[in-house]
Regions:
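Outer-membrane beta-barrel channels and translocator barrels
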Residues: 46-48, 59, 89-93, 148-151, ...
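Membrane-embedded beta-barrel scaffold of Gram-negative outer-membrane proteins
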Residues: 143-171, 309, 315-325, 340-404, ...
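Outer-membrane beta-barrel proteins
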Residues: 29-37, 59-89, 124-137, 174-190, ...
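C-terminal beta-signal and adjacent terminal beta-strands/loops
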Residues: 372, 412-415, 476-484, 502-551
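Structural signature of Gram-negative outer-membrane beta-barrels, strongest in the C-terminal barrel
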Residues: 87-91, 101, 195-198, 204, ...
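A beta-strand signature from Gram-negative outer-membrane beta-barrel systems
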Residues: 1-23, 550
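Gram-negative outer-membrane beta-barrel transporters
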Residues: 196, 202-206, 254, 260, ...
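Periplasmic-side early beta-strands and strand-to-turn transitions of outer-membrane beta-barrels
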Residues: 12, 20, 29, 40-129, ...
């Protein structure tokens, strides 16, 4: 959890292997607001050395919020994907895999509504120009794993293509004032190779290398209808980078159960931006600006962790890591000094414990953390109020605690409780343009409290027609969330209640579910443009049902 762009950690996604699982899964789900979600997957093994997976899904929604001007939903959505995975194990110590996926998404865009100037609550969505977001995504990956005597070698090769198109009624009003369009194409190739020890013993090691190339072509067009002209900005931004890393772990250090891990990573990145700016009128197109800039970044990010495993399977741990997020070019700016933004770095300190209690019927976990940021990248509005750009805050910090309890108090009942408290503030952040000092204010978009409690109660064989009956409910709470650096507008704490009832017989499961069952009224997002505040409301109460078949 250290290195390039790992400020928020890393999520590993694991899917079923056709060499270990065979079968067909069908998922059908419908709900109100025209919600539909259909999926099909098939896993098959041919012989003992080869297997394949094919899957596809389709999801759509009529939308949740009506645009008063068009009398149509502003956030309708359709998306679909297809995926194939091949696995081949020519020898016991060699595995080869190939995965390819294709995704297409078409969405009505941005159900943002103007907020009341006093209460800051959003009104109704009401703008005249249809807004949209369309994306095509193709990803192909190749993997190879070799198990040698006392070591293993792993290779991951990937290529990704994204075609992105969006249009936004930038004034969000019934008037034709601004309309923004962005067309982006991205290609990325990456390769990661590592070798690690597999022999039993007190010392474990890992060495690795990573490299990538990324090319982004981006065109941003802004139509000024009342002024009878448009601006068009073209960005060609190729980026490449390499990284080398090592990690060592010593087990049973000084005493049994105590281990020490040390890691270090070096990243180098080069990015450039070929920029052209045109003003287009009825008389033609005129070039207003152009530049070709280059940026180079390099960073060493260490990690050290100490862990003690109790004989009872509990553990204590402490970690210190350095996080790193690269700098780059802004696609919107109105001052020369705002064309670029610097890298963001952080030192992350964590102290925690995990332990089973009450004969393993209860698992408890607690973690204290402190993050010390430098040059944190923060979005700010342009002086023209027609877009946002990234700039660096001097210094920020985030500290808090997370507590988790998982229990099985009686047979068939599982209960989970999670709570997190975060105190994230600017330590040194001055906006020279506005002459405002934000030091001491809370960071925007960071909830102060997060809370979740959930329970699942399963009744086996309640009758001869049902093998398993499950009742599930969960409550999640979030807030307060500050929307801006000045802390003048925020979302108070709110809670969402969800529930589901399911019944299983043989290979088929039926379920009925509800989300936001109390109809909580809250804002999911807030921003300001054109001198006014806009927000997107959270989704209302929804209800639906599922049918799942596994055979």
């Amino acid at each position: 959890l250290y290195g390039r762009n790992t400020m928020g950690g890393i999520i590993n996604v694991y899917t079923k292997s056709p060499l270990k699982y065979e079968g067909t899964n069908i998922w059908l789900s419908n709900g109100n607001y025209g919600y539909r979600d259909y999926a099909l997957s098939h896993y098959k093994k041919i012989g003992e050395k080869f297997g394949y997976t094919v899957s596809g899904d389709f999801q759509s929604s009529d939308g949740y919020f009506t645009n008063l001007f068009t009398d149509k939903k502003a956030d309708d959505m359709k998306s679909g994907s297809a995926r194939i995975r091949l696995e081949w194990k020519p020898r016991k110590n060699l595995s080869i895999g190939l995965m390819s996926s294709f995704d297409r998404s078409v969405q009505g865009g941005y159900p943002y509504a103007v907020c009341d100037s006093v209460t800051h609550k959003p009104g109704e969505v009401n703008y005249n120009d249809y807004s949209f977001y369309k994306r095509t995504l193709s990803t192909t990956g190749f993997s190879a794993d070799y198990q040698g005597r006392g070591y293993s070698i792993n290779s991951r090769t990937a290529f990704q293509y994204i075609s992105d198109h969006q249009g936004i009624d930038q004034d969000f009003s019934p008037k034709s004032i601004y309309f923004a369009r962005q067309d982006m194409k991205q290609k990325m190739f990456s390769e990661e190779l590592n070798i690690k020890s597999t022999t039993p013993g007190c010392y474990k090691w890992l060495f690795g290398a990573f490299g990538f190339w990324q090319g982004i072509d981006n065109t941003v067009t802004l139509d000024y209808f009342t002024k009878n002209y448009a601006t068009r900005k073209l960005y060609d931004t190729p980026t490449y980078g390499v990284a080398f890393y090592h990690q060592s772990t010593i087990d049973d250090l000084l005493t049994r159960g105590l281990s020490l891990t040390f890691g270090i990573r070096y990243d180098y990145e080069h990015t450039s931006n070929d920029f052209l700016f045109y003003k287009e009128t009825d008389g033609g197109s005129k070039q207003m600006d152009a530049f070709d800039s280059r940026l180079k970044f390099s960073q060493v990010t260490p990690k050290i962790a100490l862990q003690y495993m109790f004989p009872s399977t509990g553990m204590l741990y402490a970690t210190v890591t350095k996080g790193y997020k690269t700098g780059g070019f802004n696609t919107s700016f109105d001052r020369e000094e705002d064309r670029t933004f610097r890298p963001e770095t952080s030192w992350n300190y964590e102290l925690g414990a995990k332990h089973p209690l009450l004969d393993n019927r209860l698992n408890a976990e607690i973690c204290f953390f402190w993050i010390d940021w430098k040059n944190q990248q923060i979005y700010q509005m342009l002086a023209t109020q027609n877009g946002q750009f990234l700039r660096n805050a001097g210094r920020s910090e985030s500290k808090g605690v997370e507590v988790s309890l998982q229990g099985n108090p009686v047979n068939g009942l599982m209960v989970q409780v999670n709570y997190g408290f975060t105190h994230a503030t600017f330590k040194d952040y001055k906006d020279e343009r506005k002459g405002i000092d934000y030091s001491g204010n809370f960071l925007p978009m960071v909830p102060r409290h997060t809370f979740a409690v959930g329970a699942d109660y399963t009744i086996p064989n309640p009758c001869r027609h049902i093998d398993r009956f499950t009742i599930s409910a969960n409550y999640t709470g979030t807030g307060r969330i500050q929307w801006k650096e000045d802390n003048k507008i925020s979302q108070p704490y709110y809670g969402l209640l969800n529930a589901k009832v399911s019944a299983t017989k043989d290979f088929i499961t039926f379920a009925i579910w509800g989300k936001n069952m109390t109809g909580a009224d809250y804002s999911a997002f807030y921003f300001e443009t054109g001198g006014k505040g806009l927000a997107q409301k959270g989704r209302p109460f929804t209800i639906g049902g599922n049918i799942q078949l596994n055979f």
